[in-house]
Amino acid sequence: MNRQNNNLMFQYAAVIIAFLIALFGVTLFFAGHYTPGGGFVGGLLLSCALTIIAIAFDIKTMEKVFPWDFKILIGIGLLFCVATPLASWFYGENFFTHTEFNIPLPLLQPVHMNTPMFFDFGVLCAVVGTIMTIIITIGESE
């Protein structure tokens, strides 16, 4: 995938399509737990958006635009997935007990949060990290 693709129309379309797919992935992430969606589906869509950028340009360009080490992202995701149920256990609740709380924001209404969102964020990070590590490994071997 190191060849330079000079198809400008495909590259512009890929940027727009990748943005829309990533936006839909973030929307599904925040809709999760109460409605269909969540970390896994959101992670798949974010990985799809990054893969479209890698196909339209190349992997090196994608790595310049998104300079994340996806292997570390897997570890961050697993840390969130393990820390979320352990946090409720350390507070004397049953393992994996969900908690709701509000984060007060100055001049705005408080933001309602719950602990499943942190677990879903861990799943999202693990899915994006795993898929993008596989895509980059396959793409660099060619």
UniProtKB/Swiss-Prot annotation:
GO terms for biological process: proton transmembrane transport; sodium ion transport. Keywords: Antiport, Cell membrane, Hydrogen ion transport, Ion transport, Membrane, Sodium, Sodium transport, Transmembrane, Transmembrane helix, Transport. The keyword DNA-binding does not apply. The chain crosses the membrane at residues 12-32, 37-57, 72-92, 118-138. It is found in: Cell membrane. PANTHER family: NA(+)/H(+) ANTIPORTER SUBUNIT B, NA(+)_H(+) ANTIPORTER SUBUNIT B. This is Na(+)/H(+) antiporter subunit B1. It comes from Staphylococcus haemolyticus (strain JCSC1435). The lineage of its organism: Bacteria, Bacillati, Bacillota, Bacilli, Bacillales.
